[in-house]
A protein has these predicted regions:
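C-terminal transmembrane-bundle signature of multipass membrane proteins
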Residues: 142-147, 152-160, 164-197
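Membrane-interface helix caps and helix-loop-helix hairpins in membrane proteins
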Residues: 22, 44-52, 107-116, 135-139, ...
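Membrane-proximal helix-loop-helix units in multi-pass membrane proteins
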Residues: 69-127
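Membrane-water interface of transmembrane alpha-helices
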Residues: 57-75, 184
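Hydrophobic, membrane-inserted alpha-helices
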Residues: 10-17, 34-40, 126-131, 147-155
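Short, low-complexity, charge-dense intrinsically disordered segments
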Residues: 198-206
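Membrane-helix interface "capping/anchor" motifs
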Residues: 19-30, 133-145
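Structural signature of hydrophobic alpha-helical transmembrane segments
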Residues: 1-9, 51-60, 114-124
Length: 207
């Protein structure tokens, strides 16, 4: 398969992935295993070594994400994992991890590769780590991370002459914004239901 066809094929898979993510469908992780495995070849061939390494991580993370969504249940009645807001207590450690990962990835790129875009390549890598982690836990804020990653990647792929991927990531930005509002509504319903359950429990104990 030529690089042009590989670019097109993985772009189609990418469209399917984001649609499944928008629908909160577990099959997004299956597509998320196949697509990055093929992207390793595509990115490496264009000198995007950070993205190639990230594609390896995506493949492994998709396996974890599938397991987490499939088998991880809430403690209450073994219900499926709901969409929720990220706890504020996680903000600082997440930010710290991001900056450490950014610095570490940048060091690897400038030391052991001939990457021409080490700053942005390492930036998208580090933020993608955070985004995938947040997605696996169904945190609403994961969409913020992906909006930034997708916008930067779109520009990078234009510069590197990977047109279909550039188009895909430009579209990702739009879909991610729509996905955020869809998930936000779902998160609010979960929060409201939790409040009502607590209120009913409280009322039942009042005399």
């Amino acid at each position: 398969m030529s690089l042009g066809w590989l670019d097109l094929f993985t772009t189609v898979l990418g469209l399917l992935y984001i649609w499944l993510e928008y629908r909160v469908n577990i099959w997004l992780w299956v597509v998320g295993i196949v697509m990055p495995a093929l992207d390793i070849v595509l990115y490496w061939s264009h000198g995007l070594y950070g993205d190639a390494g990230m594609a390896v991580y995506y493949t492994l993370a998709a396996i974890y994400g599938f397991w987490f969504w499939k088998f991880k249940k809430t403690r209450k009645k073994h219900e499926p994992l709901p969409i929720v807001y990220m706890p504020r207590g996680k903000y600082l450690p997440v930010a710290a991890f991001f900056f450490i990962a950014w610095a570490a990835t940048y060091y690897v790129l400038v030391t052991w590769t001939n990457s021409t875009v080490p700053v942005l390549d390492s930036f998208t890598n580090a933020l993608s780590f955070v985004g995938l982690w947040a997605l696996s836990r169904k945190y609403l804020e994961q969409w913020f991370f992906w909006i930034v990653v997708d916008a930067v990647c779109c520009w990078l792929y234009v510069q590197k002459g990977i047109p279909f991927k550039a188009f895909l990531y430009g579209l990702y930005v739009v879909i991610a914004i729509a996905g955020y509002y869809k998930w936000k509504g779902m998160a609010k319903r979960v929060k409201s239901e939790d409040y009502m359950k607590q209120r009913i429990k409280t009322d039942s104990t009042d005399f």
